[in-house]
């Protein structure tokens, strides 16, 4: 890509509306709007209801992803993503239905292989006040029981029902999945975010609510 002048290099659109872009101005490249998230999982690979903006701590386990590896009818090695069933583990040989073969759908003998992951930890709902292990806040689940945890950029953070926060306040974990106002104005290892507007975006059944913030978790 090579523009003759400043402006948008790439537009991200949904239903005809622009949701974000990559643009240039002089020697500056800007990504707009920016919300940075990481994939993560719970320790038991479950998928409970978690409110958007809930504070999440990293734990001492790494995320697990698996593929099945097998040969197609032409002798080529094929790898497809796979979700472990109860009792299965890496190295097991299983029967797998392959729908992409040139001869049509077929059942093949496949080996379960664990994918390499050296940098994405699993998480839990934060249960420690002023935790220094906060990884970010919950955004959404996908179909494979993986979640997105937002750690950078702009997003919402869930605040405890008994806490009143204001624009400019720094936030830290309240120890129950919600956030509270941090005492002091210095960025600490427990700092999650900074409130950007005195607006309640959503209020949940337990009285907790979300506010817009910039995230500062990594």
Feature map (PLM): residue ranges:
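Extracellular receptor-binding modules and their adjoining Ser/Thr/Gly/Asp/Asn-rich linkers
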Residues: 1-218
């Amino acid at each position: 890509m090579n523009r003759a002048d400043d402006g948008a290099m790439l537009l991200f659109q949904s239903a005809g509306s622009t949701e974000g872009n990559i643009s240039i101005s002089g020697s500056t490249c800007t990504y707009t709007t920016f919300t940075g998230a990481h994939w993560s999982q719970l320790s038991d690979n479950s998928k409970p209801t978690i409110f958007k903006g809930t504070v999440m701590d990293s734990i001492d386990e790494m995320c697990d992803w698996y593929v099945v590896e097998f040969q197609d009818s032409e002798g080529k090695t094929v790898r497809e993503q796979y979700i472990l069933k109860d009792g299965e583990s890496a190295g097991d040989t299983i029967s797998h239905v392959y729908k992409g073969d040139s001869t049509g759908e077929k059942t093949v003998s496949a080996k379960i292989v664990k994918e390499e992951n050296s940098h994405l930890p699993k998480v839990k709902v934060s249960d420690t006040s002023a935790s220094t292990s906060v990884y970010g806040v919950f955004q959404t689940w996908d179909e494979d029981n993986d979640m997105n945890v937002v750690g950078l950029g702009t997003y919402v953070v869930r605040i405890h029902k008994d806490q009143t926060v204001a624009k400019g306040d720094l936030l830290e974990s309240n120890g129950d999945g919600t956030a509270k106002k941090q005492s002091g104005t210095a960025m600490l290892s427990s700092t999650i975010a900074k409130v950007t507007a005195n607006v309640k975006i959503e209020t949940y059944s337990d009285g907790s609510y979300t506010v817009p913030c910039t995230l500062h978790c990594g």
